[in-house]
Amino acid sequence: MGEKASKSKRKGLSAWQLTMMALGSVIGGSFFLGSSVAINAAGPSILLSYVIAGGLVYLILYALSEMTVGAPTVGSFSTFAARELGQGTGFVVGWLYWTGTVLSMSSEATAISLLVREWVPNVSIALLGGSIIVAVTLLNLLGADKIGKLASGLSAVKIFAIIFFILTAIVLIAGLMPGTPAIGAGELAREPIMPGGVKGIAGSMLLVVFAYAGFEIIGLAATEADNPTETIPRAIRYTVFSLVGLYILYAAVLLPLIPTAELSENVSPMVASLNRWGIGWAGTALNLVLISAILSAMLACIFGLGRMIRSLSDEGHAPHWLKDKRDVPYKGIIFSGLSMLIGLFFGLLFPRAYLVLITSGGFALIFTYAVIMASHIRFRNREGCPPGGICQMPGFPLTSWIALISLIIVLLCMPFIPGQTAGLITGSSMVVIYSLIYFVMSYMRRTRGNETAKKETSPRQFHPNYATELAQEIAERVDERNKDK
């Protein structure tokens, strides 16, 4: 009993560690670089996009929290989808999420390699990217507690960088920087509020929601949390308020510093805006922060992918050799790391095809969130509040339906974003492919099961047991001899 308790204590993640792991997974390259495209599309109305997306994240996380508190399970949303919407849905959403994340993280490894090459230009991208993936994979083999602490440290670095940028921007806006006049409303006063209209906001929504992507790691880590019924809801509150607050403050202080038309997806908006006001050293510093941001995102994502693979194999949705009953899912982690390596080298060999595949990452995440909401609606309709009456979703069922419909609209708006039409087509194709794979697997299992049943119920042919006959014959001869005597 004492050994079991110490083991539980050793691997239990606190609400703070879960929050920092979620922030580590969320605030990655898509925020530091990808926010440029979203701000270009929406202009100052990007603030509204961040608020709407924050509301969606709030509803998705609390839906996930209700189901997790009701039944903490490895695999989280894929297992809930299988239970509430059918095994086929669990199979498709699990593998679609895994595929999209593997592709996204292999591209993040390429992004880190490009940044690091500024200091070591003679080292190839293949070697740098491969080394990064191997290192992040090996670190994940250390277990949840050590990864939680490492992810917390890396997350703290990039959160500090965002806070530093916000404070520096406030100093510039207020005119407290020596030798620099007060900016005030600055460029914000000259920008139209909605330069792209409703279409611009709709087009930015996918990228903004994608900037929040990664929070689902809380659900994947639920079984390794210390006292999940209390820790998970607390971690969700911390995560939602931290993310929404940081993103809105970031956008609010950025807009006065630089015209949205000057933002480029190749340069962080923070670097571009500070360079514009003579703070050039920020570029090098924020490049280091960007590297730590992507590394922490990769650490958290491989953590989740390893547990997703273990869940899929436990459900019979992945090869049997990937099953792993140990606390740390070594097989799932190594398999995911190797898949990222394959993705990295595929991207270097076939860059055009790889770019098309990467665009499916956003689709995979939004599709996953839609399935979470659909699972939650079914869960509440069938089971009511979780055990103990822990109902956290405000305004159910209306809010759950609003979130589900909003996510579907975000998917349908993908063609409004340059390059994302391919993501919609590729992601939809993946759903079809994984659905076909599931149906083929189910058919083969049914066929195999029917053949086994026929063999078990068919009449058995009589085969003489020669050993029994010999024993009977010997016994008869012994009896005859006894009679003769």
Where are each of the predicted segments found?
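Helix-loop-helix junctions that connect adjacent transmembrane segments
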Residues: 5-9, 46-47, 121-124, 153-284, ...
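Membrane-interface "cap" regions at the ends of multi-pass membrane proteins
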Residues: 1-34, 40-45, 58-62, 74, ...
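Membrane-helix boundary/coupling elements in multi-pass transport proteins
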Residues: 32, 73, 96-110, 212, ...
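A generic transmembrane alpha-helix motif of multi-pass inner-membrane proteins
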Residues: 359-365, 393-485
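TM-loop-TM module centered on a large, flexible mid-protein loop between adjacent transmembrane helices
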Residues: 79-82, 86, 118, 191, ...
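Extracellular loop-to-transmembrane helix junctions
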Residues: 10, 23, 33-128, 239-242, ...
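Membrane-interface loop-to-helix entry segments
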Residues: 113, 126-183, 236-237, 358-371, ...
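C-terminal membrane-solvent junction of multi-pass transporters and transport-like membrane proteins
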Residues: 150, 322-330, 366-422
